[in-house]
Amino acid sequence: MKKYLGVILAALVLTGCPSRPPEPTEPPATIEPVEPQVPTTPTLPPGESVPQPPKIQTLNWEASINPLVAQMLQADGVTPGSILLVDSVKNNTNGSLPIAKATGALYSALSSGKAFTLVPREQLAAAKQTLGLSVDDSLGSRSKAIGLARYVSAQYVLYSDVSGDVKSPQIDMQLMLVQTGEIVWSGNGAVQH
């Protein structure tokens, strides 16, 4: 019985505790439509014009490469009819250059002469893929170029790179004997615009 009395007393005490008074409710805010302002278009004062973007400079790879190839073909120690691996030209400048065009100009300059038998591009691409190299990646180092030349049974490898400032680049070419790694010929020149 005392238990029931204690429970009832606790219930009465708790129900008698003051609770928070109900907060007054506010009426909802009314929304007033606002007219959007029409933006004014700025007008340029007469005489001001938009500056022209810089013109893209084109490089004359054929005119830059052909004299170097002519020098190379007359170098001592070059055996006519030998198999030559032409490595793709490497870009060592401070910007971006159309290196694929340079490699194409190198191939066309060498294929017009009869001094070398060039490793076909398809065979070179297949060999790079077999060795786990990217097809359009320049080999990056002379030792990799010589290793690839050994893989395709070439006697010579032509390593070329373009260096310096992108606005006035220099092309360097080295003809190397695959068997020994000896540099048979080396030449360089400015890339013409």
Curated annotation (Swiss-Prot):
Protein origin, superkingdom: Bacteria
Biased composition (Low complexity): 28-41
Family membership noted in the UniProt record: Belongs to the LpoB family.
Name by which UniProt lists this protein: Penicillin-binding protein activator LpoB
Lipid tethering residues (S-diacylglycerol cysteine): C17
Protein source organism: Pectobacterium carotovorum subsp. carotovorum (strain PC1)
Single GO term (MF): enzyme regulator activity
Membrane topology: Lipid-anchor
